[in-house]
């Protein structure tokens, strides 16, 4: 029930930051951790699906005719890519840490605004949860006498039971909709307030902190340049690791093409 209330609240508060109000049950996860998790899942899925596609191709008539032996080199390619990820990990972590450090002040100001709005809307959320629980209890009491009829199980009884339950379901739906509308009405001013505060922060940063914006831009550019320089050795290692695989692919393909050409000439 609590999760339902919190989910509804999020629908009325704009911005992805609003969901962090009530994430108290899970350990905090840094943006970098979320990025790493996403990239890891994506790369692993891509690697597995890619191997499946290669396997299907080599099993096809054309794949057997070309005999490129792509699967023989697959482990080498994935090993090289994994090595690249390991080498770039610390470099990218450093870039993200620097970016977080540079924007710490702005993020603290925005977090303060969010906490203030949260404190204002909490009573409305508590009231909504209380009314929702009361509605569910009332519905349960009305449905309880019908359970005995359900056990009889005849088609006629089931049809009659459905006719009795339908009005109750519609009543609960209408009352829940009324509570949701009331909650939306109560939260609307605070949602607008949150938007206005955020807009004011950004406008102040734009008008009075032009130098800060320029500084953020300069530092971000500097960090990206540093990341690019530090990534060059790892990318070169990747290129060197892939060269034997590409050369093997080239030789196999040309050999298959030559053999196919000879077959055409003899026909």
Swiss-Prot record:
Primary location recorded for the protein, binned into one broad class: secreted
CC per GO annotation: chylomicron; endocytic vesicle; extracellular vesicle; high-density lipoprotein particle; low-density lipoprotein particle; spherical high-density lipoprotein particle; very-low-density lipoprotein particle
Gene3D superfamilies tied to this protein: 1.20.5.20, 6.10.140.380, Apolipoprotein (1.20.120.20)
Each Sequence repeat, start to end: 68-89, 90-111, 112-122, 123-144, 145-166, 167-188, 189-210, 211-232, 233-243, 244-267
Annotated signal sequence range: 1-18
The keyword Phosphoprotein appears for this protein: yes
PTM info: Glycosylated. Palmitoylated.
Compartments, record wording: Secreted
Family listed: Belongs to the apolipoprotein A1/A4/E family.
Protein purpose: Participates in the reverse transport of cholesterol from tissues to the liver for excretion by promoting cholesterol efflux from tissues and by acting as a cofactor for the lecithin cholesterol acyltransferase (LCAT). As part of the SPAP complex, activates spermatozoa motility.
Protein name listed in UniProt: Apolipoprotein A-I
């Amino acid at each position: 029930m609590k999760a339902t209330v919190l989910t509804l609240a999020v629908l009325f508060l704009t911005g992805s930051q609003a969901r962090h109000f009530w994430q108290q049950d899970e350990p905090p996860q840094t943006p970098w951790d979320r990025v790493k998790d996403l990239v890891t899942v994506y790369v692993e899925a891509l690697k597995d699906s890619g191997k499946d596609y290669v396997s299907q191709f080599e099993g096809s008539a054309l794949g057997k005719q070309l005999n490129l032996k792509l699967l023989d080199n697959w482990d080498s390619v994935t090993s090289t890519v994994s090595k690249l990820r390991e080498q770039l990990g610390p470099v990218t972590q450093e870039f993200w840490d620097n970016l977080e450090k540079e924007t710490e002040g702005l993020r603290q100001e925005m977090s303060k605004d969010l906490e203030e709005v949260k404190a204002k809307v909490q009573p409305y959320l508590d009231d909504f949860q209380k009314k929702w629980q009361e509605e569910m209890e009332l519905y349960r009491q009305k449905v309880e006498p019908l359970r005995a009829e359900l056990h009889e199980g005849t088609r006629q009884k089931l049809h009659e039971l459905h006719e009795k339950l339908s009005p109750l379901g519609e009543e609960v739906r209408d009352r829940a909709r009324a509570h949701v509308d009331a909650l939306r009405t109560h939260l609307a001013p605070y949602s607008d307030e949150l938007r206005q505060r955020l807009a004011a922060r950004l406008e102040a940063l734009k008008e009075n902190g032009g130098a800060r914006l320029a500084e953020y831009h300069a530092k971000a550019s500097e960090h990206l340049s540093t990341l690019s320089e530090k990534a060059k050795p790892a990318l070169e290692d990747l290129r060197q690791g892939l060269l034997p695989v590409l050369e093997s692919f080239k030789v196999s393909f040309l050999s298959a093409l030559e053999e196919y050409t000879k077959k055409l000439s003899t026909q």
